[in-house]
Design a protein with these regions (language model features):
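Charged catalytic and DNA/RNA-contacting regions of genome-maintenance
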Residues: 2-332, 348-361, 365-457, 584
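Conserved phosphate-binding elements of NTP-dependent enzyme cores
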Residues: 2-3, 11-15, 22, 537, ...
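ATPase nucleotide-binding head domains, primarily ABC-like/P-loop NTPase cores
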Residues: 37-40, 231, 301-302, 306, ...
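Active-site phosphate-binding and catalytic loops of NTP-dependent enzymes
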Residues: 89, 112-121, 252, 388-394, ...
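Amphipathic heptad-repeat alpha-helical coiled-coil/stalk segments that mediate oligomerization
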Residues: 205-212, 268-272, 284, 375-450, ...
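Hydrophobic alpha-helical segments characteristic of transmembrane helices
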Residues: 344-347, 353, 371-374, 548-556, ...
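Short, amphipathic C-terminal "tail helix"
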Residues: 366-369, 843-863
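Extended, charged coiled-coil "arm/hinge" scaffolds of SMC/Rad50-like chromosome-maintenance ATPases
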Residues: 500, 504-538
Length: 863
């Protein structure tokens, strides 16, 4: 491209684009953001915009497309969603007041994790940028929501733990570097999280520069002041993240006032499969909140509370005292109905303190934001009063952390108009009486406008022109309009300004003088109001940390009040929490399913587990009878209790659980070349290698993805391993392998349960009741009948079932198959196959090794 032939504006565009090659450049030209050349082609295709052209000095016109500046957020959001980084290049001076090319600068780079515009954010979700790094012996992770200023950092020991943290926080973007050990697992992270990933230069993560950045940002003398003195990996991740944010925001990060350094062991660990299978924040079927646990429990009244509710459900506590403090707070709120209702009414009037503070710190808050902040602050005294009367140490603590913020309230109340516009550059923001100089200017312009408004009547009377009128437009300013039929009556002091088809427009020296006074005064008023507003905003910025502290406390009050509200409405009870190993639930219910039962009542069930005599519950019964629901509901009850919520049952005792694992259902991962069975075995290996004696494990139909004997072998060995003294994790194991039920008499800690079914006239009725003992029937044909399978097929299936059960028919086998080896697999006599299975150390076996072992077992079976 011959740059010397380009127009000055296009040279400016290309020079800017050269600095932001990896971004779509939105270049401000008047009332539009324009894109040129390749960017224009890309954007016109992605957003279905018209592709035009612009003369640029070259022989061919430059491809061009544009979007209105006032609607840019909508288009930027769509581009970011499609995986593009967007650089916004703004006009830095008034085009009408400068000579030559207008000065332009990139004022912000927008990426998935750095969005600050409220119109592009979901109010009930955090928008986290995550930063990860490591050296193979451990990893650092930091994450921040730039729109709220919330910032966190931690260290983890291995990649599995890092993946769990990433899933838990659900970031919108991840940054790392090629020099990190994380880079070797980048494909695994991408597949596991499906989050946009940005690789940065290694210099971002250098310990010295990262530490220096943190010390400057948080104004501390050493890392001890922010809790990172012995966490260098977390320090590097956090420093790199803040550097990246500074680079994209192009301004100081005033909303990031503190960093919360946490230990991952302080909360229950939930992996991706568990969050998905228990439908904690969204449903498996259509990925919506309705139908999930969050959909039932989230009756919060603020956006801050709703975001925190999601965090609490993904990170239940695993220490007795903090859990009890939350439960005591919920109890106090539940018992005092009047206070609870008053608190909820206060919260309904509270806007998003966090994001309002973020907008003030970033300089993007407008007059509407200020009045929203003032109105939110106005209810804090009543909120504090209601909290002070409740018997709860946690609520007392939160009440003390809510600052009245009176100075901010008074500052806004005195200065900002009640009904101010969204824009801050066109006046109408500052209250009368706040500035004498501003009021004086407004008075002078008022007098001039009154003179102008009375001019048409006085001129009609003076000239005798009955249809004379005074008007205004942006191009010609004020004018006096006279129709053609009255030209002969026009006075000599009228100066022609514009000719129309049927009229002439004039100006007089007096009108011109008043016009100058009005327009100059308007510009001065707008400028003065803008400067006063910015001054007020800067003054409030000094209170950002106080606002954020109040936001954190109000959000917690909102979640606790929501827990109390839902518990009262649904008849939940306060669980007992201790450090023992017992989980006991009397008449437990599934909190979500019971909400969707239109007719009838949800069938409640009991649960009792401990590590000594009932660590393994083997659950048999037909499909659709309720095995999975029973297991899920008990896992959810544990999760709810440790999150601090009351639970759906008549009584409940829970010995703290450190992790919940679920292996429920499976499907092929075709993109990764993995079969259903491989996915199932990978998940099982992960659980067996990660569980502790304080874990709760939910296993549904282990081994069904392969042949009967292979599957039974794996299920059998898994039960034995989980009941071994080495682990003894509390486990619920649903299976159709009825052969496993004999283990109740052989291994201490195994208890058989089954789902009760009633048979009437060849039909079955699912009672959904869990009872002691085992069942030897799966009722598969009955379930097929309920599903609408053709009668002819069902009759044939019933005949075949009778033959198989009587032993009159045997599966077709080759002459070379040695059935005795399979039939004696679990006999009291030793067999090579059983020895092989027993020799496998599942704690040390990787998924790939497990697959090879399974292949060897299969070869033995087929000999």
């Amino acid at each position: 491209m011959a740059k010397e032939k380009l127009s000055p504006m296009m040279k400016q565009y290309l020079e800017t684009k050269e600095q932001y090659k990896d971004c779509i450049l939105l270049f401000r030209l008047g009332d539009f953001y324009e894109m040129f050349f390749d960017d224009a082609v890309t954007v016109s295709s992605e957003l279905e915009l018209t592709l035009t052209g612009k003369n640029c000095g070259l022989e061919e016109r430059a491809p061009m497309c544009g979007v209105p500046f006032h609607a840019a957020d909508t288009y930027i959001a769509r581009l970011v969603e499609k995986g593009h980084k967007v650089a916004i290049c703004e006009q830095m001076e008034d085009p009408s007041a400068c000579k030559g090319i207008v000065k332009r600068e990139v004022i912000k780079i927008v990426t998935p994790g750095t969005i600050t515009s409220t119109s592009m954010l979901r109010e009930n979700e955090n928008n986290y940028l995550a930063s990860v790094c490591g050296d193979g012996e451990g990893y650092g992770i930091a994450y921040c929501d730039i729109s709220t200023g919330e910032t966190y950092a931690a260290e983890v020991s291995d990649m599995d733990e890092l993946l769990n943290e990433i899933v838990k926080i659900s970031p919108s973007e991840i940054i790392s570097n090629e020099g990190s050990a994380v880079f070797t697992d980048i494909d695994r992270i991408r597949k596991y999280t499906d989050v946009p990933y940005e690789l940065l230069n290694d210099s971002y993560f250098e310990s010295e520069s990262a530490c220096d950045f943190l010390l400057r940002q948080f104004k501390v003398a050493s890392l001890t002041g922010i809790g990172l003195e012995e966490k260098m990996k977390a320090c590097c991740a956090a420093g790199a993240m803040l550097s990246y944010l500074l680079e994209t925001q192009k301004q100081s990060l005033g909303q990031i006032t503190s960093i919360s350094v946490y230990e991952t062991g302080n909360s229950m660990s939930l992996d991706k499969a568990t969050i998905r299978n228990l439908e904690i924040t969204e449903t498996l079927y259509d990925k919506t909140v309705k139908g999930s646990l969050l959909g039932v429990l989230d009756k919060t009244n603020t956006a801050m509370g709703s975001r925190l509710m999601k965090r609490w459900l993904r990170e239940p506590l695993n220490s007795v005292l903090p859990v009890k403090r939350r439960l005591d707070a919920v109890e106090a709120l539940l018992d005092n109905v009047l206070a609870r209702n008053n608190i909820r009414e206060c919260l309904r009037q509270v806007y998003d303190f966090y994001r309002l503070a973020g907008k003030i710190a970033s300089g993007s808050a407008n007059g509407k934001d200020m009045t929203a902040l003032r109105n939110s602050i106005a209810v804090l005294p009543e909120l504090k009063y209601e909290l002070s009367g409740l018997d709860s140490s946690l609520l007392d603590e939160l009440e003390s952390e809510i600052s009245p913020l009176e100075e901010i309230h008074d500052m806004i109340n005195e200065a900002i108009c009640e009904d101010c516009p969204y824009t801050i550059r066109e006046g109408g923001i500052i209250r009368p009486g706040y500035s004498e100089e501003l009021d004086s200017l407004k008075d002078s312009i008022k007098d001039a406008r009154e003179w102008i408004s009375s001019l048409d009547s006085s001129e009609r009377e003076r000239t005798g022109i009955k249809n004379l009128k005074v008007g205004y437009n942006k191009v010609f300013g004020y004018y006096i309009e006279v129709s053609k039929s009255n030209y002969d009556l026009v006075p000599e002091n009228y100066i022609r300004k514009q000719t129309l088809v049927n009229a002439e427009r004039y100006i007089t020296p007096e009108l011109k003088e008043m016009e100058s006074l009005v327009l100059n005064a308007e510009a001065k008023i707008n400028s003065m109001e803008y400067n006063l507003f910015c001054e007020i905003r800067d003054n409030i910025n000094r209170y950002i940390q106080e606002i954020q502290q109040t936001a954190a406390a109000v959000a917690q009050v909102d979640v606790l009040t929501s827990f109390a509200h839902v518990s009262a409405a649904n008849g939940y009870i306060k669980p007992e929490i201790d450090n023992g190993d017992t989980i006991s639930v009397t008449k437990g219910r599934h909190p979500v399913i019971e909400q969707f039962i239109k007719d009838g009542v949800f069938v409640s069930n009991d649960l009792y587990m401990n590590r000594d005599d009932s660590s393994m519950l083997l659950i048999t019964g037909p499909n659709m009878a309720g095995k999975s629901t029973y297991m899920r509901q008990n896992a959810i009850i544990v999760l709810m209790a440790q999150a601090g919520c009351f639970v759906p049952c008549e009584s409940c005792q829970i010995g703290i659980v450190d992790r919940i694992f679920t292996r429920i259902g499976a499907s092929d991962n075709l993109a990764a070349g993995q079969s259903t069975f491989f996915v199932e075995m990978s998940e099982l290996a992960y659980i067996l290698n990660s569980a502790t004696d304080r874990s709760l494990i939910i296993l549904d139909e282990i081994g069904r993805g392969t042949s009967t004997y292979d599957g039974l072998s794996i299920a059998w060995a898994s039960v034995e391993y989980l009941c071994s003294s080495k682990l003894k994790a509390r486990t619920m194991f649903a299976t159709h392998y009825h052969e496993l039920t004999v283990l109740e008499d052989e291994i201490k800690g195994i208890c058989n349960l089954n789902v009760d079914v009633a048979e009437e006239n060849g039909n079955i009725v699912f009672l959904h009741k869990i009872v002691s003992g085992s069942t030897s029937r799966s009722y598969g044909i009955h379930v097929a009948k309920l599903a609408g399978v053709p009668a002819q097929l069902l009759e044939r299936a019933d005949e075949k079932l009778s033959e198989l059960e009587s032993g009159s028919t045997h599966p077709v086998t080759s002459a070379e198959e040695k059935q005795p080896v399979q039939m004696s697999l679990f006999s009291t006599e030793q067999s090579p196959l059983a020895d092989k299975i027993r020799s496998v150390d599942l704690m040390e076996t990787t998924p790939s090794q497990a697959l090879r072992i399974l292949e060897e077992l299969k070869e033995v079976l087929e000999k």
